[in-house]
């Protein structure tokens, strides 16, 4: 069958490596950007944001906790005359920046200070933030960064737990791709070979560098950043998160919703994805033991108990996971797992 016209946006300029933060002025000049709104966090990322502001012609800095999602939905008209929105910080900062850039129809510059997730380069925001926006009447947020600047020296200074979360995110891509192919074969879902290969390449970057990643430095940070950037571009090409988000993410999202409902502290996204991948590889009949071995080598948690979740919450989340995105077919099927099947998978893999 002949496909119709395809259109996707990818970042126009990507700069990463030591001292990349010093290239902000050069990037902005190249892109013709002058006036900007910089969204950032506190202390460390605020300091980095100041370095970014010094290289702008006219930039204002505000903290993400000063911004309510309801304000963003109303439009933030006070900033309608800026050329770009820059996110300088972690996951929430980058997500808030995407939402503002999307609502104001402005260019987005992504300047992450941690490498904990693939949102640093993708057009999409976190599941929970999108869920909150849906309740406010906002549709699917999609905003591809025009430029991405990652100073690997700065990212390497962040606590190792953030890098481990990024690695955990990348370990899950194998499952996402297996599920995507399954959905393509069984439900006729659109499938992009180029996006799939890019996501697989990102996964393999981690698998091929496990021994190196037992260390923590700029070189190891660069490996993870490069893989996360590849995932972001894969999602942009596919026009969805499908190349990088399968049943392992459905389970993680289900955990997030239940944790919020029951008032349980949520674990880091990448940690949940890594553990969820073990379960889904088991269900696929794939080599889940290899992932557990890698997680132990790198110091990632290998049980949900380590993440602070009790057995009942985890079982319930696994049983509900298929309901998160019913439009996406995965190894969980249309009806999900029975309690017996969920408990068996958790016990057989030893993650409970």
Curated annotation (Swiss-Prot):
Localization annotation: Cytoplasm
InterPro entries (alphabetical): G1P_dehydrogenase_arc, G1PDH, Glycerol_DH
Enzymatic reactions: sn-glycerol 1-phosphate + NAD(+) = dihydroxyacetone phosphate + NADH + H(+); sn-glycerol 1-phosphate + NADP(+) = dihydroxyacetone phosphate + NADPH + H(+)
Major subcellular site: cytoplasm
UniProt key word Transmembrane helix: no
Biological-process GO terms, alphabetical: glycerophospholipid metabolic process; phospholipid biosynthetic process
UniProt keywords, alphabetically: Cytoplasm, Lipid biosynthesis, Lipid metabolism, Metal-binding, NAD, NADP, Oxidoreductase, Phospholipid biosynthesis, Phospholipid metabolism, Zinc
Signal peptide, first to last residue: none
Binding site for substrate: 118, 169, 253
A Gene Ontology term for the protein's cellular component: cytoplasm
Free-text comment on the cofactor: Binds 1 zinc ion per subunit.
Domain of life of the organism encoding this protein: Archaea
Residues annotated as binding NAD(+): 91-95, 113-116, 122
Pathway: Membrane lipid metabolism; glycerophospholipid metabolism
Annotated residues for binding of Zn(2+): 169, 249, 269
Co-factor(s): Zn(2+)
UniProt-recorded Gene Ontology molecular function terms: glycerol-1-phosphate dehydrogenase (NAD+) activity; glycerol-1-phosphate dehydrogenase (NADP+) activity; metal ion binding
Pfam families documented for this protein: Fe-ADH_2
This enzyme's EC code(s): 1.1.1.261
Chain's role: Catalyzes the NAD(P)H-dependent reduction of dihydroxyacetonephosphate (DHAP or glycerone phosphate) to glycerol 1-phosphate (G1P). The G1P thus generated is used as the glycerophosphate backbone of phospholipids in the cellular membranes of Archaea.
Record note on quaternary structure: Homodimer.
UniProt similarity note: Belongs to the glycerol-1-phosphate dehydrogenase family.
Protein name as annotated: Glycerol-1-phosphate dehydrogenase [NAD(P)+]
